[in-house]
Amino acid sequence: MANPIRKLVDNSKKQLKKLNHIADKVEDYADEMAALSDEALQAKTPVFKEKIADALRDVTETDKQNKVLAKTLDALLPEAFAVAREAAKRVLGLYPFRVQIMGAAVLNDGNLAEMRTGEGKTLTATMAVYLNALTDRGVHVVTVNDYLSARDAEQMGQLYNWLGLSVGVNVGDAPAEEKRAAYDADITYSTNFNIGFDYLRDNMVRRAEERVMQRGLNFALIDEADSILIDTARTPLIISGPGSGVSQLYGRADRFVKTLQQDEDYKIDEEAKTTMLTNDGIHKGEIFFNLDNLYDAGDTALTHHIDQALRANFNYINDKDYVVQDGEVKLIDQSTGRISEGTRLSDGLHQAIEAKEGVEIQEENKSMAQITYQNLFRMYKKLSGMTGTAKTEEEELREIYNMEVITIPTNRPIKRVDYPDLLYPSIRAKYNAVVKLIQELHEKGQPILIGTGSVESSELLSKILMAQNVPHNVLNAKNNAKEAEIIANAGQRGAVTVATNMAGRGTDIKLGPGVADLGGLAVIATERHESRRIDNQLRGRAGRQGDDGFSQFFLSLEDDLMIRFGAERIRAVWERMNLDEEETVIKNRLITRSVESAQKRVEGNNYDTRKNVLQYDDVVREQRELIYHQRDIIIDESQSLDWVLMPMVSRTINRVVTVQTKSKKPSEWQLQQIIVFAENVLVNEGALTENDLSGLSREDIEAKLYALAKENYANKKRQLYEPEQMLEFEKVVILRAVDQHWTDHIDALDRLRQGVGLRGYGQLNPLIEYQNEAFENFNKMIADVEYDATRTFMKAEIRQNLKA
């Protein structure tokens, strides 16, 4: 049996050999490009574009086009990369290193380049972006926030503009015209959030010219790809409309759970992040709400509100999971430490937290359109990404996105020292040790970056440092306005920076004068994050580009991660070694391995959650793609939609006639009901009598009704003198029916997904149950769309002054 470790090593060597070969080819062009004048170098862009156009000129089939295009880009890669490289030197004063060429080749292949902090990912991307922008199909450079989109577009846009390519920035609240212009550019910088919502909104428009993304999804290059493809994947993008108001049960449920005692009335499951009532708690609930049975089948709304109130009060912590700002509950992205603006928890949980915090409870919204980031990015013809940390999630990236994670060598050897974790018996003892080390390092002027797990922890440590007269800056979700400035100065002599996870990404920390002689940047972490990637990002802040530096993690048995997964086992070791003194510390690789084992369990749970979200969205995906495709056909039609509308009429007639003539005896057929249907939906009252249908076969009845409908259609066509008016009328009728029933369907599926998990208690597979009901509901929705479109069109009264 082959050794899997050996296989991975061999595969890695093979990949690096291929990348080195590509880098050789690019570097072979270096002297030739350096000898060109600016005009000659700039003239390469139209030459490349012409070569691509020539290769695709006689290819019409889409799949074949994509293959020819990929082959053409591979052939152009060495020279195009060399052009972009030389242009970067002239325009930006930066000349990509060999390892950056290798990283760009990985990106062009549709894979993920893992490059250490400070290795120049932004410059690396320029070569792959330039090559793929030559196709005139659009390149989307995806970032985690609007600030980075604007910054990178401004900095790198100088290079692209110089090479004759246009650059656009898609900002969240920009008008549609500006968004359209940004997407029409050769290269578009945008956040994943903006692209996702623009895609959903584009599939809700009624006119082709209202779309902002006119070219579809071609090539996406994602910066901080692990954050976008992994960390945000648990939360689907949802466009909502007004709901049915605010339930009074939120306040009542919140008041009830605040009367309960832990362990006696409820038990908290830290691992699953849920809280359940005990028998005593259930009894108290029955008294509080004056009920005989709290879990009566007819009172599921109340129990749902109680469940959410329990989670809100005991699983979601202020200043850790969310903050309250300006009278609103705002979520904190646990992977970045930043506020997730505009994001709300679903299923009434956000409202339960609002009730807990005593702020205005906003009404629940109705889901109108939704998609997961997984399915959004899987729609791109080519997807690539770059980040400093992704190897730990390689399996998920391969399985979900079909991307390989390829680690790019550093330009200089890494000199940073990562010390083993230090474990203390209590949080107090841990903080004492942290502050002691900070004071020692600060006295000699060595810059220190202290990573904390939450806003609450950062503020606690800040208070301790203030009491010890240690000057410092604090960076967290409440104080992110000066993020770039604070992080940029964090490497200066004497700087002490306390930060949440937001310090792990974005702006580089460059060492100030004399800092290298002091040992470089010191990274101190006050706890382990539940993801190894986040820890590695924090470590990677020290030792960039071969700088000196070190990282040290301080843990305690009272940390959240330890309580959830590792504390009991480690406490047993503690007791066997008689280490019960408050200041005792364990410094052992075994502790580090135990913690990493706990992290792997959390990562596994999180992966299962993301996979579960995707499995449910995959059920909707086929339906969504079908509906969106049909909408596009209707919107883009330029002649007539009779070929869409009349088959809808035919199928509607067939469904009604089939139901009303299901008896084998024609004498038992419900002919009067068919006439009622015809008068309500197809024709004017009195246009059809029972005698007209008596004696006819089922097929003849359908043919009779269809002939009347066809005649009605022809009359309307004559009444609307201009073909454009008829087409516009058809579009409005069909799209209104589709949109109304599709949004109702999406909302129903959302509610089904939230409740279907309970069927697991009945030994049923919730996902299969969801699939079956979603399929049945979709077929019913199609029938409802066709019925409404038929009725609206056939019963509409056309007036001479009608403007569609």
Curated annotation (Swiss-Prot):
Principal cellular location given in the protein's record = membrane
Tell me which EC number(s) this protein carries. Answer: 7.4.2.8
Question: Which positions bind ATP?
Answer: Q100, G118, E119, G120, K121, T122, D508
Membrane topology term:
Peripheral membrane protein
- Residues that span the membrane, as ranges: none
Catalytic activities: ATP + H2O + cellular proteinSide 1 = ADP + phosphate + cellular proteinSide 2
**Where does the UniProt annotation locate this protein?**
Cell membrane; Cytoplasm
Return the Pfam families for the record.
P-loop_SecA (PF21090), SecA_DEAD (PF07517), SecA_PP_bind (PF01043), SecA_SW (PF07516)
What are the GO BP annotations of this UniProt entry?
Answer: intracellular protein transmembrane transport; protein import; protein targeting; protein transport by the Sec complex
The record, for CDD domains, names: DEXDc_SecA, SF2_C_secA
Q: Which UniProt keywords apply?
A: ATP-binding, Cell membrane, Cytoplasm, Membrane, Nucleotide-binding, Protein transport, Translocase, Translocation, Transport
Q: Name one GO molecular function term.
A: ATP binding
Show the Gene3D superfamilies listed in the entry. Answer: Helical scaffold and wing domains of SecA (1.10.3060.10), P-loop containing nucleotide triphosphate hydrolases (3.40.50.300), SecA, preprotein cross-linking domain (3.90.1440.10)
An example of a Gene Ontology cellular component annotation for this protein is: plasma membrane
> Sorted alphabetically, which InterPro entries does this protein's record hold?
Helicase_ATP-bd, Helicase_C-like, P-loop_NTPase, SecA, SecA_CS, SecA_DEAD, SecA_motor_DEAD, SecA_preprotein_X-link_dom
Q: What does this protein do, in the record's words? A: Part of the Sec protein translocase complex. Interacts with the SecYEG preprotein conducting channel. Has a central role in coupling the hydrolysis of ATP to the transfer of proteins into and across the cell membrane, serving as an ATP-driven molecular motor driving the stepwise translocation of polypeptide chains across the membrane.
What assembly does the database describe for this protein? Monomer and homodimer. Part of the essential Sec protein translocation apparatus which comprises SecA, SecYEG and auxiliary proteins SecDF. Other proteins may also be involved.
Family membership noted in the UniProt record: Belongs to the SecA family.
Protein name (Swiss-Prot/TrEMBL): Protein translocase subunit SecA
